[in-house]
Swiss-Prot record:
Potent inhibitor of cellular proliferation. Gene3D superfamilies: P-loop containing nucleotide triphosphate hydrolases. This is Ras-like protein family member 10A. One of its GO terms (cellular component) is nucleolus. It catalyses: GTP + H2O = GDP + phosphate + H(+). One of its GO terms (molecular function) is GTPase activity. A motif (Effector region) lies at residues 33-42. Its EC number is 3.6.5.2. It holds the Pfam family Ras. It comes from Homo sapiens (Human). A lipid is attached at C200 (S-farnesyl cysteine).
């Protein structure tokens, strides 16, 4: 048994958080968007590099019901959405929505501010969803990726939950990096591009 990992999938409403999780776990895609009614917790077992890990994947909007993704001052206390005890984060935005990218930017800052002193740094993967709508994107991929990787020091990846493109890859990269962070004796690996040889599958 490999152990357990706690993952939070966060982002503005409507960016496709639940769709990404459902593609990863069940291989399906909801054609009609239905707002997530409160936080949901999924507990799959995953085989990664020959070891089995129990995952806790938290899905839910950070902002409370009826609120807008305007800024962190509108969000609940960090303890209410488990920022402090999460091992890894997926921050999802819509590549066609600059507001959702600003939301992720503020959310990343909120995560950094609420981590307890001395706690290990949790890896963050910023994910641009809806790559199938590439022609409508608000900014070039290379510029956004450079900002996230160099400026924010986070991983960056784009996916399409609708067509299940890069969905498995994003979880594989996030989980492997979380395991490396949990074992400081191992050589440091960069989040982006470190996991192409790794094997990851659901049990």
């Amino acid at each position: 048994m490999g152990g357990s990992l706690r993952v939070a999938v966060l982002g503005a409403p409507g960016v496709g958080k639940t769709a990404i999780i459902r593609q990863f776990l069940f291989g399906d895609y909801p054609e009609r968007h239905r707002p997530t009614d409160g936080p949901r917790l999924y507990r799959p077992a995953v085989l990664l590099d020959g070891a089995v890990y129990d995952l806790s994947i938290r899905d839910g909007d950070v902002a409370g019901p009826g609120s807008s993704p305007g800024g962190p001052e509108e969000w609940p206390d960090a303890k209410d959405w488990s920022l402090q005890d999460t091992d890894a984060f997926v921050l999802v935005y819509d590549i066609c929505s600059p507001d959702s990218f600003d939301y992720v930017k503020a959310l990343r800052q909120r995560i950094a501010e609420t981590r307890p002193a001395g706690a290990p740094e949790a890896p963050i993967l910023v994910v641009g969803n809806k790559r199938d709508r590439q022609r409508l994107r608000f900014g070039p991929r290379r510029a956004l990726a450079a900002l996230v990787r160099r400026g924010w020091r986070c991983g960056y990846l784009e996916c399409s939950a609708k067509y299940n493109w890069h969905v498995l890859r994003l979880f594989r990269e996030l989980l492997r990096c979380a395991l490396v962070r949990a074992r400081p004796a191992h050589p440091a690996l960069r989040l982006q591009g470190a996991l192409h040889p790794a094997r990851c599958s659901l049990m």
